[in-house]
């Protein structure tokens, strides 16, 4: 009886040890599995473009490790605390934060060209399907500019020009140009792209890249793209902004320097036509090769935008004129800059200087005679009677000689018959051909043909004759008396 009890105890002890050995071997086999059994590979994509009509593309093959992981988990008994911690750490390491890495944050595209954006998608979904149904949204936010040169200049100095949210650029309504969805089965879907073939969105499933092409870029395509990766609950996981800067070099640069009179200040305007964006042009001035600085109280600049042509800038400057020196060479230097691109151009003009003529008007022998000194060639005379232009009044204008004080200037004389209308008439001699106001150089006088004016000279003459006769008569009488009286005595 006692021996039987001892045998039972030995068997029981051996049985528990066997069970313990079996469990230990099973635990050891589970712990010896590789750590990557429960880890999905990075999404394997086949290179095919996303269609714009919403048709699903080729599916992503399911990872074969999923089935293996499920089988192992089924065969595994209740894990120990150590194995649970190891599995949890492994699962946490699989939760890599997704990211979008683009080749550039700013893309400069010239007008009518194609703009391209290329980004890498770093997406490594864990075994649970938290990110297995992700979404990729591409939104375009256009940027327009205020047509206010003061704002543009202040923003350019502050470095804020073109920054969304600033006072110098304001976005129009955002436009969702593509929304790409991945369902749990691995199929990709995309929403139709707006504006026809304007945008082309693609995903390379092998290289894990996505791209956006903007074809035939115009001014409305200036703005920034938002590329947002969302989870299955539509929560944003990562967001990137890529700016598309539409560029256009100035089409032409011209300097206009209007003619001036001697002693008056020179004025010049620099016109920079058809560039983009506003604020990308810098203007500087030169006078005979030396730097000239515009004055804020009388000089400035302004710009406007022409649809389909771009911006045009006009900058003005005022320069002193002593009247003793030759007209200066006024130059405008223009630098257009966008990113690392720089384009320069310049234009030069020399203003023409005119000198004040001397005009005198007199009446003689039934004519109004105008005498002009020191005028350039091409200047003629127009007569006005009571401020009414008279026809055919330039034929009787002749050159009387050369100006003695100004080279290549000459003297003129012109006349017109006075009207015998027994009235007081205004005659005006006006110089035509100067690039100034038409009444800038003229002289006016009145000719009095009234009866009182005509009779006055005759009365004066008769009075003078009678006075002279009376004076002579009195003289003769006095002389006669002088001779007569002494003889009588």
UniProtKB/Swiss-Prot annotation:
Comp. bias (Low complexity): 70-81
Entry GO terms, CC: membrane; virion membrane
Gene3D superfamilies for this protein: Immunoglobulins (2.60.40.10)
Predominant location category: virion
Signal peptide per UniProt: 1-32
Stretches for region Disordered: 59-94
Side Virion surface, residues: 33-455
Positions with biased composition (Polar residues): 60-69
Cytoplasmic-facing ranges: 487-489
Topology in membrane: Single-pass membrane protein
Keywords, sorted A to Z: Glycoprotein, Host-virus interaction, Immunoglobulin domain, Membrane, Signal, Transmembrane, Transmembrane helix, Virion
Keyword RNA-binding: no
TM helices/strands, residue ranges: 456-486
Protein's cellular compartments: Virion membrane
Family matches, as InterPro entries: GA_GC (IPR001038), Ig-like_dom (IPR007110), Ig-like_dom_sf (IPR036179), Ig-like_fold (IPR013783), Marek_A (IPR001654)
Domain Ig-like span(s) in chain numbering: 250-348
UniProt superkingdom: Viruses
Residues of this chain annotated as glycosylated in UniProt: 92, 112, 204, 346, 392
Stated family: Belongs to the herpesviridae glycoprotein C family.
Protein name as catalogued: Envelope glycoprotein C homolog
Source lineage: Viruses, Duplodnaviria, Heunggongvirae, Peploviricota, Herviviricetes
């Amino acid at each position: 009886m006692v021996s039987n009890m001892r045998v039972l105890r030995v068997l029981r002890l051996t049985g528990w040890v066997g069970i313990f050995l079996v469990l230990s071997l099973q635990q050891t086999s589970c712990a010896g599995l590789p750590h990557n059994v429960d880890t999905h590979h990075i999404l394997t994509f086949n290179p095919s473009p996303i269609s714009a009509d919403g048709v699903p593309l080729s599916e992503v093959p399911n990872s074969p490790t999923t089935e293996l992981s499920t089988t192992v988990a089924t065969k595994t008994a209740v894990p120990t605390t150590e194995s649970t911690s190891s599995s949890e750490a492994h699962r946490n390491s699989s939760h890599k934060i997704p990211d979008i890495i683009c080749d550039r944050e700013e893309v400069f595209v010239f007008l009518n060209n194609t703009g391209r954006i290329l980004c890498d998608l770093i997406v490594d979904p864990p075994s649970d399907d938290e990110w297995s149904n992700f979404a990729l949204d591409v939104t375009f936010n256009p940027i327009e500019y205020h047509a206010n040169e003061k704002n543009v200049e202040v923003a350019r100095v502050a470095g804020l020009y073109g920054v969304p949210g600033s006072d110098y650029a304001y976005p129009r309504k955002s436009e969702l140009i593509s929304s790409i969805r991945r369902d749990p089965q691995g199929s990709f879907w995309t929403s139709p792209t707006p504006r026809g073939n304007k945008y082309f969105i693609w995903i390379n499933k092998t290289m894990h890249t996505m791209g956006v092409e903007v074809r035939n870029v115009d001014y409305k395509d200036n703005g920034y793209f938002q590329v947002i990766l969302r989870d299955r609950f539509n929560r944003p996981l990562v967001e990137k902004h890529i700016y598309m800067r539409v560029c256009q070099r100035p089409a032409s640069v011209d300097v206009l320097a209007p003619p001036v009179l001697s002693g008056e200040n020179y004025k010049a305007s620099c016109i920079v036509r058809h560039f983009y964006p506003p604020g990308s042009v810098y203007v500087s001035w030169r006078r005979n090769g030396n730097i000239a600085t515009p004055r804020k109280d009388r000089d400035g600049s302004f710009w406007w935008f022409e649809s389909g042509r771009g911006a045009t800038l006009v900058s003005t400057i005022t320069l002193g004129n002593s009247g003793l020196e030759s007209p200066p060479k006024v130059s405008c230097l223009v630098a257009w800059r966008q990113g690392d691109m720089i384009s320069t151009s310049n234009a030069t003009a020399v203003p023409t200087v005119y000198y004040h003529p001397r005009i005198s008007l007199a009446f003689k022998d039934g004519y109004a005679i105008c005498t002009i000194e020191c005028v350039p060639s091409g200047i003629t005379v127009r007569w006005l009677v009571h401020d009414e232009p008279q026809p055919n009044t330039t034929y009787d204008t002749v050159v009387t000689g050369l100006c003695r004080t100004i080279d290549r200037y000459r003297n003129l004389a012109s006349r017109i018959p006075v009207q015998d209308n027994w009235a007081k008439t205004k005659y005006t001699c006006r110089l035509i051909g100067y690039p100034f106001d038409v009444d800038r150089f003229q002289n006016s006088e009145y000719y009095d043909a009234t009866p009182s004016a005509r009779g006055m000279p005759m009365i004066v003459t008769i009075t003078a004759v009678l006075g002279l006769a009376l004076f002579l008569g009195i003289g003769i009488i006095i002389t006669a008396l002088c001779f007569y009286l002494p003889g009588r005595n």
